[in-house]
């Protein structure tokens, strides 16, 4: 063999490969231009680009098929590279968000160390992803100015510092910052204190139809992007006399999406918008903002946005709610009945299946990034129900919400709900089974927050997608050797060891079942229900466990017998514990349910 010729050949191959990689990693230039008529526009690779986008975790293939061209992130996660690659494959672009600390979450904008760390992180992220062809622009922060006047100068000066830094290292992508609407002095602050911010991103809901005019009245001159829009927020809705916010039906929400989009898009300063949210989300209720159900069915907002983005309606439209009405008063005495009448139909004439669910209402309505209350179905409340309505009787006092979901059976759905109140003292209510601690498609009211023992060695991935027992994900847990005893407990409330009220009445349950498997097989683990003793003010009314279970390499279902147990208040529904070990242990959990 001619060794010199061989080396030349290898060298040429390596150079060719590197050249290909450089080409593949080349940024697509994006410009921001203003025309003589006052209109602003993005140019991507020299061509006009109007953002037709959304944000959320639902399928990006469905998003591209719906006619959208962009999605946004709120921060830079470990999977951003994969998201950018998928976007490029699908012909989508990404507005990459850089999450900035919020003062209400403990971030101090007068703390030099915290600012330097945030600055360094943003710089590293920009350097890492600036040459990816799917990047459209950068978004610095999301509602980091807070909910008051939004005029804290040190926040805006830090944002200006970040924007100036990004412009030094990346000339290919415009920069925006995102605020919660435009009240207070937000517009003034961005315009006066942030000259290197090119675009104002605005999250707007009920106020979006009037936003373009209000922006001009505030002397807004920078182009803007509607970075979140959807139905009116809970803070914009007139509450009932007992303080509960009524929610629009999914059909009514779709009409609002259309109206809000058309008005905002008509502004010469608008560069596009992002519908919220491309997925499901529990915030205020289980259906307020989601454009999909947690089980994957689309709602009418998807149909409307598909028509707007693509210029044509989807072949299968969601069921239409023509009427959803509570008969009589929304406040009654214990034992009285509520009646709801429903008129729902499918545009294509498909038979519609209707599901009804009654839940207790939360004591407060959390928004944004606060830990959310999870609505759980109550048992033995609904007397009768059909596709025409429902009748229910609640034995005790409290505020409740009746949910209706209609399905066409081919991927479309519709939602409606109504808050109601029963006078008098709260009665002990039981929850409908099965109730999941962890399972795809189920609400999960307990958090895996109780990390115990030598927990520094632990890692937990709740969205592990390789070989789940069912659905799309399972839990992967790894304990890195060597370690002393360790474990994790699921809790309600999160991080509570018996000092706070919480938990659920699971009296109807006879067992807890779960599926588990070990990476190698033979892993010895204890599993149980209930940890908190009666010496705590708020304790688990039942405790039981399976000792030293030897896991198999293949999935196996296990069952914890709960017959005869007092399940009137379970705060710790599931836990596992491993004894000290000199070997790293990896195991998997799935489908943890009370039945």
Question: Regions from the language model: what does each represent?
Answer:
Residues 425-595:
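Beta-rich carbohydrate-recognition modules and glycan-binding surfaces
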Residues 416-423:
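C-terminal edge beta-strand
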Residues 33-37, 43-197, 209-210, 373-376:
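Active-site mouth of glycoside hydrolases
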Residues 181-212, 234-238, 279-286:
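Substrate-binding cleft/loops of secretory-pathway carbohydrate-active enzymes
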Residues 339, 399-403, 511:
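Short, conserved beta-strand segments of beta-strand-rich sandwich/propeller modules, principally
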Residues 36, 44-53, 216-372, 382-387, ...:
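Substrate-binding clefts and catalytic carboxylate motifs of secreted carbohydrate-active enzymes
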């Amino acid at each position: 063999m001619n060794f010199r010729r061989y080396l030349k050949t290898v060298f040429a191959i390596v150079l060719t490969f590197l050249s290909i990689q450089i080409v593949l990693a080349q940024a697509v230039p994006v410009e921001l231009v203003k025309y003589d008529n006052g209109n602003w526009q993005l140019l991507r690779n020299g061509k006009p680009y109007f953002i037709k986008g959304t944000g959320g975790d639902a399928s990006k293939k469905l998003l591209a098929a719906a006619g959208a061209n962009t999605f946004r992130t709120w921060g830079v996660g470990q999977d951003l590279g994969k998201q950018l690659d998928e976007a490029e494959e699908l012909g989508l672009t990404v507005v990459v968000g850089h999450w900035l600390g919020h003062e209400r979450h403990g971030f101090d904008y007068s703390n030099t160390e915290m600012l330097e760390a945030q600055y360094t992180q943003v710089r590293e992220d920009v350097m890492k992803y600036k040459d990816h062809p799917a990047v459209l622009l950068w978004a610095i922060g999301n509602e980091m100015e807070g909910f008051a006047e939004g005029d804290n100068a040190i926040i805006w000066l830090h944002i200006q510092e970040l924007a100036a830094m990004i412009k030094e290292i990346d000339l290919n992508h415009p920069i925006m910052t995102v605020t919660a609407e435009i009240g207070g002095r937000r517009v003034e602050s961005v315009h006066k204190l942030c000259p290197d911010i090119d675009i104002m991103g605005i999250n707007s809901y009920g106020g979006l139809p009037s936003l373009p005019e209000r922006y001009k009245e505030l002397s807004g001159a920078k182009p803007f992007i509607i970075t979140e829009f959807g139905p009116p927020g809970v803070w914009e809705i007139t509450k009932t006399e007992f303080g509960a916010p009524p929610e629009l039906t999914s059909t009514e929400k779709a009409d609002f999406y259309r109206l809000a989009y058309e008005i905002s898009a008509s502004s010469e300063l608008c560069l596009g918008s992002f519908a919220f949210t491309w997925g499901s989300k529990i915030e205020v209720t289980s259906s307020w903002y989601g454009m999909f159900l947690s089980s994957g069915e689309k709602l009418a907002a998807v149909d409307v946005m598909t028509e707007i983005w693509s210029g044509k309606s989807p072949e299968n439209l969601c069921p239409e709610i023509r009427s959803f009405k509570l008969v009589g008063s929304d406040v009654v005495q214990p034992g009285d009945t509520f009646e709801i009448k429903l008129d729902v139909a499918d545009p294509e004439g498909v038979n519609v299946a209707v599901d009804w669910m009654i839940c207790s209402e939360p004591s407060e309505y959390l928004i944004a990034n606060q830990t959310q209350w999870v609505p759980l179905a109550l048992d033995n409340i609904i007397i009768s129900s059909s596709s025409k309505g429902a009748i229910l009787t609640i034995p005790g006092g409290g505020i409740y919400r009746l949910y209706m979901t209609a399905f066409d059976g081919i991927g479309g759905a519709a939602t409606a709900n109504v808050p109601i109140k029963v006078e008098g003292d709260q009665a002990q209510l039981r929850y409908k089974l099965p109730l999941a601690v962890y399972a795809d498609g189920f609400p999960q009211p307990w958090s895996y927050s109780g990390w115990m023992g030598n927990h520094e060695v632990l890692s937990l991935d709740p969205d592990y997608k390789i070989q789940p027992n069912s659905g799309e994900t399972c839990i992967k847990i790894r304990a890195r050797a060597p370690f002393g005893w360790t474990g994790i407990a699921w809790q309600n409330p999160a991080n509570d060891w018996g000092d706070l009220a919480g938990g659920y009445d699971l009296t109807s349950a006879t067992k807890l079942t779960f599926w588990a498997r070990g990476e190698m097989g033979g892993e010895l683990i204890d599993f149980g229900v209930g940890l908190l003793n009666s010496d705590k003010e708020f304790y688990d009314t039942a405790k039981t466990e399976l000792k030293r279970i030897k896991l198999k390499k293949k999935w196996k279902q296990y069952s914890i017998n709960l017959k005869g147990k007092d399940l009137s208040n379970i705060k710790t529904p599931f836990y596992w514990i491993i004894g000290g070990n000199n070997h790293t242990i990896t195991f998997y959990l799935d489908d943890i349910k009370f039945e």
